[in-house]
């Protein structure tokens, strides 16, 4: 099941990247990892760097995908974002923390993508 969930996650991230590029974002990083945490997608548009968490699900039985971005997960993303900005020397940008929710339909290849800008703040 874990392997299956990972492949759903990677597929959701690929769909998210395609969506963001169509919306005019440039992708800076995908799956950025450091000791502080991981960021699924880092993108930029209009001088705003977006740190994006992607949550993909087949069911809302465990709540909406965004609800799984807990306070501790938010802290890890924020710390990883600070580290990323520091090592890349990106000091003169606005930043934003977004969530992309993807709800897959079990009986078809359809899905719903919901882009939640400014989903949480520092």
From Swiss-Prot:
GO molecular function terms noted in the UniProt entry: nucleic acid binding
Listed InterPro entries: Restrct_endonuc-II-like, tRNA_endonuc-like_dom_sf, UPF0102_YraN-like
CDD domains (alphabetical): PoNe_Nuclease (cd20736)
Pfam families: UPF0102 (PF02021)
Gene3D superfamilies in alphabetical order: 3.40.1350.10
Family per similarity comment: Belongs to the UPF0102 family.
UniProt name for this protein: UPF0102 protein CPE1705
Species of origin: Clostridium perfringens (strain 13 / Type A)
